[in-house]
């Protein structure tokens, strides 16, 4: 049975009714739950299994029965490991019903359906007693309740409740404890994700300066989770060694504190600005701390030397440490970075956590009182994503737009309409002397931020437009330029910004014949690649540590077919990929004739050996009709693609990715099709792999 859902179309900008199966939300939740990523984490699986074997063997040797509680069992993999390791009884709980039902079938398929008691509820709702959920307390808890911040999924409260209500006084836990680490760093590149810089002209003079409220804003305390190992080596400087800041003892019977703070005195290893805190954690899975799993970036990983010695030749050193996307590293931005003038200079790092999150500050003097969690006071951080803030600061990108604007804006004569959200570059046309600039800014917070920049820079003749259809005919006929980056807050995939074309068509008949439209064209490109790891988020598991998980694969595949787009957005700079061919154009859109439909097909010859486990897609925006590379702004590779080599991707935008259902390492070609219906806002791609 199907139903209709109200869905925003990013290309048309309109809400529409879409027919979907009535269990669409269920399938979407299953497909995006992320269990597959964890099951491909070989180190996690092997070390959990080793810890279970060691712990259960030790309990047996001490003459103890072993009654295991598995909180958040997922596929049931840890419960099955516990049984195989010799547990007397295993109780598994899972509140996500689709996953719980799948686990029940997996237990049966693996011959343990009658040996695991499955409870379909949260652990905090479980009751102990005769005829209740569990007949007795467990004396071994195994769980994976962690995220990038360690505590973001509620681990503190869940462990506190488990020890109080579900576990014996002498219960052991896997993992036994966790340690959190911080390392202070400076990075002009990474700091672009956090604050707005001066926008200079091509001659280096300041065109737009951020107002005082932006400069004084402390930003958001929230983590920026990234694959820290993929930050280019020359783009950051480590100012300290990694330091342990907090421990979380999962085995302790006493309650784990929900709020803690710690002030650490540090010495700078080299001069610099203490702009960033790099953060990660490790877990000791057994009581003795012998089985260690670290989420450290490669340069701080305790097993780097051993892993490097056994790595494949083509794998970069940054990728020798075990890959995982469910536990990454994080960047925290220091509100007011202190300048460390010399190596050896003392400074202080203030570390804090509440029940679900962490935050940091750095200062030259010890603070007299508790450092409060900081929040955005300038609209920038609460309105735009980290990648968008970085994009606004991207020098090469900005120069290409300014090259066009400085060449075409005639002071006191040009009348400019700017389409998009937070278009600082369009605003720059006012600083270049345009007679009038009208900014399409329907978003309240974005408009408020832009207006603060207008006021601070004393720009004249700037107006705001909430709805382009409200523009007077006399205003439209006077326009000399319609300009966009384009960027819209609702956009997820690069071509979602084709909304620029939709807005343009609403005005087309009233615009002067010689109006300058920029960008004038957009081209979508595709590149077959071999990912080192990213494909695992959609790849089937098959078996894991000897357990058959094909039922899980089938469930996820069924849901993905109904609820996952054939192309999804990913920040590809974080996920190394090797080009298997030259990029090929799939679509060219002329914005002056945006409403034209396109139905295209072709094929891409794979010129390199390897497994084509992904197809990357992006948009090139052509600012004018010259085809000059300096007039093209790409959302794809930041350097020329060389087949067989790793691709360097733009770090301030997400690209599109298609994951083939059945990747092949056979040489051949990728057949593709493109179907674009602009009036309906439909842009669909099809891909299939063919042998030569």
From Swiss-Prot:
EC number: 2.1.1.-
Top EC class for this record: transferase
Keyword vocabulary terms for this entry: Methyltransferase, Repeat, S-adenosyl-L-methionine, Transferase
GO terms under biological process: peptidyl-arginine methylation
Highest rank taxon of the organism: Eukaryota
Record flagged with keyword Transferase: yes
Keyword check for DNA repair: no
SAM-dependent MTase PRMT-type domain segment(s): 14-359, 368-692
One GO MF term attached to the UniProt entry: histone methyltransferase activity
Pfam family, one: PRMT_C
UniProt cross-references to CDD domains, sorted A to Z: AdoMet_MTases
InterPro entries, A to Z: Arg_MeTrfase, MeTrfase_PRMT7, PRMT_dom, SAM-dependent_MTases_sf
Family: Belongs to the class I-like SAM-binding methyltransferase superfamily. Protein arginine N-methyltransferase family. PRMT7 subfamily.
Free-text function comment from the UniProt entry: Essential arginine methyltransferase that can both catalyze the formation of omega-N monomethylarginine (MMA) and symmetrical dimethylarginine (sDMA). Specifically mediates the symmetrical dimethylation of arginine residues in the small nuclear ribonucleoproteins SmD1 and SmD3.
Name the record gives this protein: Protein arginine N-methyltransferase 7
